[in-house]
């Protein structure tokens, strides 16, 4: 199974209940448009239809009716088989990060410079990507700061992150492009950083890297400071796949596709 096939199945499982209950959502348009960023609404509809028809129920037709409403609304929004067609990437980013905004709005892009945020478990190839594509830009690396300070990865004091953010602010104030190099495994962490960077007028590009598990283990064996396998497993369990709406651009570099 390829990366894309795996993610398609994962998103169908995650959003499988949306056709039945979308109409109860507070921001109905928003939830459907956000879902359409990562999954085909047509496939969700077919999955929900099969689910409804396979149930033993006193009112088997109710879920199917909800599914038909879902299909009609998805088609009306123009997201039946593709993501919403925003006016530009700036408008798209703002739509997904503001409380209330019409998707058909046209906003002027006032970003001034670019910031790249790396994401992925250790040994996925982030450093290699930076070497090949960084273009000499400043790199703020949490691992690098740990080595600089002689701080153990187990140290939870926050001094490494605080210093990294302090250095990032210096570059942000100067509107200087840079690369933020860390695992950034959860959506919460990525969105907190996006909020910081965009607050200074940056366009944030998220670069997610992934390598086969066997390759990760092989690389770990030749690493100077090896990561215990249980720690790697915990990080994989913790990983939340970056979604296209999280940044101005989200790229997926799989199996060394740099």
Cite the ranges covered by each PLM segment.
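Divalent metal-dependent catalytic cores for phosphoryl transfer on phosphate-bearing substrates
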Residues: 1-68
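Conserved GTP-binding G-domain of TRAFAC-class P-loop NTPases and closely related GTPase folds
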Residues: 116-119, 124, 136, 213-258
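Conserved substrate/cofactor phosphate-moiety recognition/catalytic segment
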Residues: 127-178, 213-217
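Short catalytic-loop micro-motif centered on adjacent basic/acidic residues
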Residues: 178-182, 206
């Amino acid at each position: 199974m390829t990366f894309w096939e795996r993610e398609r199945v994962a998103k169908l499982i995650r959003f499988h209940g949306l056709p039945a209950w979308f109409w109860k959502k507070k921001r109905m348009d928003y939830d459907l448009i956000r879902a359409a960023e990562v999954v085909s609404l047509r496939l969700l509809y077919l999955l929900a239809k099969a689910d409804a028809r396979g149930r033993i129920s006193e009112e088997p037709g109710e879920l199917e009716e909800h599914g038909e409403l879902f299909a009609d609304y998805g088609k009306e929004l123009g997201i039946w088989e593709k993501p919403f067609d925003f006016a530009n990437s700036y408008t798209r980013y703002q739509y997904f990060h503001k409380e209330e905004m019409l998707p058909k709005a046209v906003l002027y892009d006032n970003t001034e410079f670019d910031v790249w945020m790396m994401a992925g478990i250790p040994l996925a190839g982030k450093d290699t990507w930076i070497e090949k594509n960084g273009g000499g830009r400043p790199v703020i690396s949490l691992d690098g700061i740990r080595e600089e300070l002689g701080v153990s990865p187990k140290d939870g004091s926050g001094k490494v992150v605080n210093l990294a953010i302090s250095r990032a602010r210096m570059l942000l104030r100067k509107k200087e492009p840079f690369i933020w190099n860390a695992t950034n495994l959860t959506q919460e962490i990525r969105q907190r950083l996006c909020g910081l960077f965009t607050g200074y007028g940056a366009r944030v590009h998220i670069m997610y890297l992934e390598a086969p598990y066997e390759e990760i283990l092989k690389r770990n064996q030749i690493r100077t400071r090896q990561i215990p396998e249980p720690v790697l497993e915990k990080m994989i369990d913790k990983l939340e796949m970056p979604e296209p709406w999280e940044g101005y651009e989200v790229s997926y570099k799989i199996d060394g596709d740099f």
